[in-house]
């Protein structure tokens, strides 16, 4: 899984480890990733293999899949957790930040799925009663426009569409994909909005973690393309 050193990704890694999964975790910052791996290993008692990778470098993304395949030879769950976002009005968004968000949030996810699909299909064929899953951390901004998040929302819409394509092409083979699309979750990535939304009013990391775990327990006969999670209140379509 990518984006495993912090926030929702780290929470999902911890929960899957406790559920008995052997983990290959990835993040860009090696020191933070190693700390996460040591913590996860202590908590879960299972195998945790850290692979530092820059999601903007295709060779790193490909190397991550190869490293997992060489170590385990199977892939039950691929979690697309790496992501980056910037808040800015559409007219003031730089091309550099546009490119970075699409490189990390969309291109890297596409390459990961493309590289991992043969292994996912192989795993699903070996255990047809369970199949294999792709879980993508998307956003409600991929479904409903949010001011100042035009590019971020566009990348998440692409991620949602990627999951739908996986289902259209691979669900008959036992491989299904689910995009989890929450509003603001109480993590360090949402610190910039806490002057408007109190953390106590945000979605909890554990809420998303439990949804991800539930998806892993579904049979291949149940395909869930996306899950939308909103905060309480009257404007349920807003992040």
Show where each model-derived region lies.
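Conserved glycine-rich Rossmann-like NAD(P)H-binding loop of the short-chain dehydrogenase/reductase
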Residues: 19-36
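Active-site loop immediately N-terminal to the catalytic Tyr-X3-Lys motif
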Residues: 91, 144-150, 201
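Conserved glycine-rich cofactor-binding loop
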Residues: 5-7
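Substrate-binding pocket helix/loop in short-chain dehydrogenase/reductase
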Residues: 89-90, 94-99
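Active-site helix of classical SDR
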Residues: 113, 155
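Residue(s) in the substrate-gating loop at a strand-loop-helix junction
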Residues: 139
């Amino acid at each position: 899984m990518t984006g495993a050193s912090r926030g929702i990704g780290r929470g999902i890694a911890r929960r899957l480890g406790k559920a008995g999964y052997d983990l290959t975790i990835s993040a860009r910052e090696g020191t933070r990733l190693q700390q996460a791996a040591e913590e996860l290993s202590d908590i879960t008692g299972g195998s945790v293999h850290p692979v530092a990778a820059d999601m903007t470098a295709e060779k790193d993304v490909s190397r991550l899949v190869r490293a997992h395949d060489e170590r385990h030879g199977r892939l039950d769950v691929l979690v697309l957790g790496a992501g980056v976002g910037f808040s800015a009005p559409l007219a003031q968004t730089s091309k550099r930040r546009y490119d970075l968000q699409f490189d990390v949030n969309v291109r890297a996810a596409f390459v990961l799925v493309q590289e991992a699909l043969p292994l996912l299909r192989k795993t699903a064929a070996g255990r047809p009663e369970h199949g294999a899953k792709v879980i993508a951390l998307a956003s409600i901004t991929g479904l409903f426009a949010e001011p100042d998040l035009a590019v971020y929302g566009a990348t998440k819409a692409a991620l949602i569409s990627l999951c739908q394509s996986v289902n259209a092409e691979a669900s008959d083979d036992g491989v299904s994909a689910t995009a989890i699309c929450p509003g603001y979750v109480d993590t360090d990535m949402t610190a910039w909005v806490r002057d408007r939304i109190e953390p106590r009013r945000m979605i909890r990391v554990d809420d998303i973690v439990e949804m991800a775990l539930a998806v892993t327990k579904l049979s291949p006969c149940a395909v869930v393309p996306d899950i939308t999670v909103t905060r309480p209140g009257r404007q349920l379509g807003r992040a």
